[in-house]
Structure formats: structure tokens, C-alpha cells
A protein has these predicted regions:
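Short, surface-exposed charged micro-motifs
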Residues: 40, 60, 128
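A short beta-strand-loop micro-motif that forms or neighbors metal/cofactor-
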Residues: 64, 130-147
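Long cytosolic regulatory regions associated with cyclic-nucleotide signaling
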Residues: 91-102, 116-118, 135
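Glycine- and acidic-residue-biased ligand/ion/polar-headgroup-sensing regions
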Residues: 56-77, 90-98
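A short, N-terminal "cap"/entry segment at the start of jelly-roll beta-barrel domains
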Residues: 1-37, 50, 80-93, 102-110
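Conserved metal-binding segment of the jelly-roll/cupin
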Residues: 46, 110-133, 140
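Conserved short histidine dyad/triad with adjacent acidic residue
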Residues: 40-55
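Short hydrophobic/aromatic-rich beta-strand segments that constitute the beta-sheet cores
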Residues: 50, 70-72, 139
Length: 147
């Protein structure tokens, strides 16, 4: 049996300080055949978590300590046409540039000291995390990890 306690939290935050990514993951799965993702993630301010999504599963996030924002986005896709001098030639070649941007639609503040403990991120939602102070979160998702 494993206990998630203050000693573990302190150790994970210390490891995150030594990690160039300013975060440290702790896998809670119990066997290689486990088909879920359960982990603790120690996150420090200025860590960069790219905007991403999980197409086939919701994600549950519980903040054990610290303060952070889960930020949800809409994906905005546009197509830029070529410059006017090459327009006709490019039209024939279907040479448009696809441009993807993300527009913030929701910000969920997590801070256990303020009784704001967690959130559930919907399947397919684009999201990231912005860390305000050193934090440790519990994350859970269906399915095995795919890099």
C-alpha cells in the first residue's frame, strides 16, 4: 500500500526544482497492463505545458497543494491566401496556408486553501495549466499513455 503524504509532496517538488522542465511526474499505475493513467504531477511556476487535448477521454484534475489555473481553449482554424502576385498560380495549386490559433474560453482556478479542489476537463477539450505557486496535482485519464 502506498500513502500520499506531505513527505512525498515535498520530495516531488524538490525533484521538480532539479528538472529543467520545472515539473515532476509520479506514476501511480500498479502494473504494465494497467489501462488507465493515474499520476501525481509536481508543477512549478514558469513550467511550460503546451496546449493539448485528449481526444478519447475526460481528464480529472485534483489539486493537492498550491495554486494554479486550468485553462480551456477553442481551436480557431483559418486559411491564409497567398500574396496577390502569386494568387492565380497558387489558387490552381490549392496553396493556402492553414493557421491554427487558440482562444481562451474558460479559466478554472484551483487552490485547496480556497476550497477549489479540482475539475473535470471534457473529452477533446484543448487545455493547458498555468502554475501560480508550486503545486502538486492528481491527474486521471482513461486509456494507456501514448506519447
Amino acid at each position: 500500500m502506498m500513502e500520499i503524504n506531505n513527505e512525498l509532496i515535498i520530495e516531488l517538488l524538490a525533484q521538480a526544482k532539479e528538472n529543467p522542465r520545472l515539473r515532476q511526474n509520479y506514476d501511480l499505475r500498479t502494473s504494465p497492463g494497467d489501462t488507465s493513467q493515474r499520476m501525481l504531477n509536481a508543477l512549478l511556476p514558469e513550467t511550460s505545458v503546451p496546449i493539448h487535448r485528449h481526444e478519447n477521454t475526460t481528464e480529472t484534475v485534483i489539486c493537492l497543494c498550491g495554486k494554479l489555473d486550468e485553462v480551456i481553449y477553442d481551436e480557431v482554424v483559418s486559411y491564409e491566401k497567398p500574396s496577390s502576385e502569386n494568387f492565380q498560380q497558387s489558387m490552381d495549386a490549392q496553396d493556402f496556408t492553414r493557421k491554427v490559433e487558440y482562444r481562451e474560453i474558460q479559466r478554472i482556478h484551483l487552490c485547496p486553501a480556497q476550497a477549489k479542489y479540482g475539475c473535470q476537463i471534457p473529452k477533446g477539450a484543448w487545455h493547458t495549466v498555468e502554475v501560480i505557486e508550486p503545486s502538486v496535482i492528481f491527474e486521471a485519464k482513461d486509456g494507456s499513455y501514448k506519447a
